[in-house]
Amino acid sequence: MTEARRRQFKVGRVVSNKMQKTVVVAVDYLKPHPLYRKIIRRTSKFHAHDEQQCRIGDIVRIGETRPLSKTKRWEVVEIIKRNEEA
């Protein structure tokens, strides 16, 4: 029998909330260039389940979960900082 994996968490910014109960979260990370070794900033986008609470620009923590749809494998665990402008 396989061991249960620890749940992974990521912190990112909400870039889209146009879908029902789904937000797109952009997570920035730093990675060295393979040849020149300069540190460059990269961005990954994740679709996360949200019960229509997040707004664009919010900083959120997302956690890994079971597959909820074709592209959704994450859920919003908490809203760390609300966007003041929206």
UniProtKB/Swiss-Prot annotation:
InterPro entries: NA-bd_OB-fold, Ribosomal_uS17, Ribosomal_uS17_bact/chlr, Ribosomal_uS17_CS. Pfam families: Ribosomal_S17. NCBIfam families: PRK05610.1 (NF004123), uS17_bact (TIGR03635). This is Small ribosomal subunit protein uS17. Part of the 30S ribosomal subunit. It comes from Roseiflexus sp. (strain RS-1). One of its GO terms (cellular component) is cytosolic small ribosomal subunit. One of the primary rRNA binding proteins, it binds specifically to the 5'-end of 16S ribosomal RNA. Gene3D superfamilies: Nucleic acid-binding proteins. The lineage of its organism: Bacteria, Bacillati, Chloroflexota, Chloroflexia, Chloroflexales. It comes from the Bacteria. CDD domains: Ribosomal_uS17. Keywords: Ribonucleoprotein, Ribosomal protein, RNA-binding, rRNA-binding. GO terms for molecular function: rRNA binding; structural constituent of ribosome. One of its GO terms (biological process) is translation. Belongs to the universal ribosomal protein uS17 family.
